[in-house]
UniProtKB/Swiss-Prot annotation:
Intracellular or extracellular location(s): Endoplasmic reticulum membrane
Gene for this chain: DFG10
Disrupted gene: phenotype observed: Suppression of filamentatous growth, defects in cell polarity, and cellular elongation, due to defects in N-glycosylation.
Homology family: Belongs to the steroid 5-alpha reductase family. Polyprenal reductase subfamily.
Enzyme class: oxidoreductase
Organism: Saccharomyces cerevisiae (strain ATCC 204508 / S288c) (Baker's yeast)
Reaction(s) catalysed (UniProt annotation): a di-trans,poly-cis-dolichal + NADP(+) = a di-trans,poly-cis-polyprenal + NADPH + H(+)
GO MF annotation, one: polyprenal reductase activity
GO terms under biological process: dolichol biosynthetic process; dolichol metabolic process; dolichol-linked oligosaccharide biosynthetic process; polyprenol catabolic process; pseudohyphal growth
CC per GO annotation: endoplasmic reticulum; endoplasmic reticulum membrane
Official protein name in the record: Polyprenal reductase
């Protein structure tokens, strides 16, 4: 079967949208039935493997080092550089490149992952998928000339403020005594202000291309679930002593 260029782009966009639909549905299924898939870092609670464990159980509980987070940003930075080569005059490409490069720097030089800090293999694959499809839809939109080559100043200012705030919050987390309760800044009000920053950062992409609404929905859904996991962990460990009243969005969640 032969597809012309227009059909190929159309079906690629359909596949992009479908992947987010499947991904979001999978999040809720995992939350209800397979919580191990959503745990990482301090919220990851390993269970002893019996020698009689089934192969399926071993696959379900397989983990990788949390330091592999850097792979997400190596990938995003590389794909952004390739996109910059072809579309150097579009501000949104520089914005995504800058975000990827900053997160790579933080992962390598700010955040400190111990050898015991781990995440489920599914979390790792989802990260690779997310940054791949993010750059895929960016390139498709650029190719279709549906993205303006001008800078949205309001969105850019919000992006810069949220990026700076996220960096400062990551510094606080990096300087914590292992698995202690973070304090200061917005940590007094929400357990995961760095997740809130991430949501704000991705919301600033919408003025450039409405297709990014799916990436925003994904970020809101996945990080809200992670923030609720973190809040539950804090409540269990610190018995509600000075735990922030909200998980991610002040006065809402």
């Amino acid at each position: 079967m032969y597809f012309d260029e227009e059909q190929l782009l159309k079906y690629t966009i359909y596949a992009y949208r479908l992947s987010f639909f499947v991904g979001i549905c999978s999040l809720f299924i995992a939350k209800s039935c397979l919580p191990e898939f959503l745990q990482y870092g301090k919220t990851y609670r390993p269970k002893e493997n019996s020698k009689y464990s089934s192969i399926l159980e071993r696959i379900k509980k397989f983990t990788v080092p949390k330091a592999y987070f850097s792979h997400f940003y190596y990938l995003a930075t590389f794909l952004s550089l390739v996109t910059l080569y072809f579309y150097p005059k579009f501000p949104i490409v520089w914005i995504i490149f800058g975000h990827s490069l900053r997160r790579l720097y933080e992962t390598l030089y700010v955040l400190h992952y111990t050898s015991n800090s781990r995440m489920n293999w599914s979390h790792y694959l989802v990260g690779i998928w997310f940054y791949s499809v993010l750059l895929l839809i960016l390139n498709i939109s650029l190719y279709k000339n549906s993205i303006p080559n001008t800078l949205n100043m309001n969105a850019f200012i919000i992006f810069c403020i949220a990026s700076w705030d996220q960096y400062k919050n990551h510094v606080i987390l990096a300087n914590l005594v292992k698995y202690s309760l973070p304090t200061g800044r917005l940590f007094r009000l929400v357990c995961c202000p760095h997740y809130l920053d991430e949501i704000i950062i991705y919301s600033t992409l919408l003025p450039y291309e409405q297709e990014f609404y799916l990436t925003l929905v994904w970020v809101i859904t996945s990080l809200t679930i992670s923030a609720l996991e973190t809040k539950n962990y804090y409540r269990h460990k610190f018995k509600d002593n000075h735990v922030a009243p909200y998980a991610i969005i002040p006065f809402i969640i």
